[in-house]
C-alpha cells in the first residue's frame, strides 16, 4: 500500500495536526497505564525537534458527543506530557475557530468526542480540523477502522495527509505478515467463540499454511472431529463450519486437553486424551502433547500471526498451553506479529515482549485488517497519496 510518510516531509514551521491514540485509563486525574502515550511520544518529539507547530489530539472514553465532561478531559494526558517532554504543554478547549502557535510549541486539542459531528464524520467539522493545519498526521492505528472526522474527514480536506511513524510501522508489519509472507505462515487464533472470530478464521484459512486454534474456539473444532467436549464452552451450530474450514486449511486440532469439573482458578487440571473427556468435564487448556506439537509447528514457521490465548491462562493451572505457545514464538527465528487485548496480556504475563517482532497497538483495527477489510483511515491516506 502506498501512503505519504510523515518522515519524508519537511515539517519546519508547518502547522502539524497529529491524530494520536491517547485513549488511556485515568483514575483520580492520573494516567494509570501510559503504554499508548509512550507509543506516541516519538512522533510528537520528531515534530517538535523539526521546528513544527504541533497540535495533537485523541478521543478518550465515551462521553456524550458535543458535551464537555471533565471526566473525559485530556488534561491528565497533558500533565503526563509536561513531565515526559519537560516542556510547557498547553490544553486547548476551544480550538475549532483557529489557534496561534509558535514553532517548537505543542498544544493538546481537547477530546475530539466533545465536538458534535465527530463520530458521523461530518464535513463541517472535518473542514474545521483541516483548516487548523498544513499537514495532517494519522498516527492512531487503533482507530483506523473508524471513519470519523478526526481520523478520516480531516485527512480528506487537509492540504497534506500522511501516516505517522507508528501507523507506518504497523502497516508495514501487517503487510509483511499477510500480503507477502515468508512461508510457512502459521496463524494462531484463540478466544472463546468461533462466531466472534469467524471472519478472521475464514480469511486466515485462505492464506495460512497452518491455522492453529485455541481457547473455546478449539473446543468447537474438537467437537467437529466427533469428540465429546462435555460442559465446555463450544458452539454446536458452528460444528459444520469448523468441518468446512478443516477441509480448506491445515488445522491441527488438540489430541489432549486440560480439564476440570468447574470454572475455578483453584480447580485441579486433569490431563486427558480428547477421546476420554466426560460429560461433566470442562476443557480449559491444551494438554502437554498438543502444546509440544504446536510449538514444533511454530518453531518451523517463517511468519507467525498471533491473535488470542489458547487456554484460560489467567488461571495458574491452565496457563501451560499459552505459556508453551508464547515460548515457541519467543524462540522462533521467524517474523512474528501479535495483536488483540488478551494476546498483549499473555505477552506481558510470560515476559516475551522483546522477542515478538511486532506487537500491534490496534484491537478492532488489527482484527479488521486480518479479516481483509478496508480500513477507512488507511484508504483515505492511499487516496491522498495518489493526488
UniProtKB/Swiss-Prot annotation:
GO MF assignments: ADP binding; ATP binding; phosphoglycerate kinase activity
Keywords for the protein's UniProt record, in alphabetical order: ATP-binding, Cytoplasm, Glycolysis, Kinase, Nucleotide-binding, Transferase
Pfam families to which the protein is assigned, alphabetical: PGK
Enzyme class: transferase
Pathway: Carbohydrate degradation; glycolysis; pyruvate from D-glyceraldehyde 3-phosphate: step 2/5
Binding-site list for ATP: 197, 314, 340-343
HAMAP family named in the record: Phosphoglyc_kinase
Protein's recorded name: Phosphoglycerate kinase
Organism from which the protein derives: Aliivibrio fischeri (strain MJ11) (Vibrio fischeri)
Gene that encodes the chain: pgk
Amino acid at each position: 500500500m502506498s501512503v505519504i510518510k510523515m518522515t519524508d516531509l519537511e515539517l519546519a514551521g508547518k502547522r502539524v495536526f497529529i491524530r494520536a491514540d491517547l485513549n488511556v485509563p485515568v483514575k483520580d486525574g492520573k494516567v494509570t497505564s501510559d503504554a499508548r502515550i509512550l507509543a506516541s511520544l516519538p512522533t510528537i518529539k520528531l515534530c517538535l525537534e523539526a521546528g513544527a507547530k504541533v497540535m495533537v489530539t485523541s478521543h478518550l472514553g465515551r462521553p456524550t458527543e458535543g458535551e464537555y465532561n471533565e471526566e473525559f478531559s485530556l488534561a491528565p494526558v497533558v500533565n503526563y506530557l509536561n513531565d515526559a517532554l519537560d516542556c510547557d504543554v498547553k490544553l486547548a478547549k476551544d480550538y475549532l475557530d483557529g489557534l496561534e502557535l509558535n514553532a517548537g510549541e505543542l498544544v493538546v486539542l481537547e477530546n475530539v468526542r466533545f465536538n458534535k459531528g465527530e463520530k458521523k464524520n461530518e464535513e463541517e467539522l472535518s473542514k474545521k480540523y483541516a483548516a487548523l493545519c498544513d499537514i495532517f498526521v494519522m498516527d492512531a492505528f487503533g482507530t483506523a477502522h473508524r471513519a470519523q472526522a478526526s481520523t478520516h474527514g480531516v485527512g480528506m480536506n487537509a492540504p497534506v495527509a500522511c501516516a505517522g511513524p507508528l501507523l507506518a510501522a504497523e502497516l508495514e508489519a501487517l503487510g509483511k505478515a499477510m500480503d507477502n509472507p515468508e512461508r510457512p505462515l502459521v496463524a494462531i487464533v484463540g478466544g472463546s467463540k468461533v462466531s466472534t472470530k469467524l471472519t478472521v478464521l475464514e480469511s486466515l484459512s485462505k492464506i495460512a499454511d497452518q491455522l492453529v486454534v485455541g481457547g473455546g474456539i478449539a473446543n468447537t473444532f474438537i467437537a467437529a472431529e466427533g469428540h465429546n467436549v462435555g460442559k465446555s464452552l463450544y458452539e454446536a451450530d458452528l460444528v459444520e463450519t469448523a468441518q468446512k474450514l478443516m477441509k480448506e486449511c491445515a488445522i491441527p486440532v488438540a489430541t489432549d486437553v486440560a480439564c476440570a469439573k468447574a470454572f475455578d482458578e483453584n480447580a485441579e487440571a486433569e490431563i486427558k486424551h480428547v477421546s476420554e473427556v466426560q460429560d461433566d468435564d470442562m476443557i480449559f487448556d491444551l494438554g502437554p502433547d498438543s502444546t509440544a506439537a504446536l510449538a514444533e509447528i511454530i518453531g518451523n514457521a517463517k511468519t507467525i500471526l498471533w491473535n488470542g490465548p489458547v487456554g484460560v491462562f489467567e488461571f495458574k493451572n491452565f496457563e501451560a498451553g499459552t505459556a508453551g505457545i508464547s515460548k515457541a514464538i519467543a524462540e522462533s527465528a521467524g517474523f512474528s506479529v501479535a495483536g488483540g487485548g488478551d494476546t498483549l496480556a499473555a505477552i506481558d504475563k510470560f515476559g516475551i515482549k522483546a522477542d515478538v517482532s511486532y506487537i500491534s497497538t490496534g484491537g478492532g483495527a488489527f482484527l479488521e485488517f486480518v479479516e481483509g477489510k478496508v480500513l477507512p483511515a488507511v484508504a483515505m491516506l492511499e487516496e491522498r497519496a495518489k493526488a
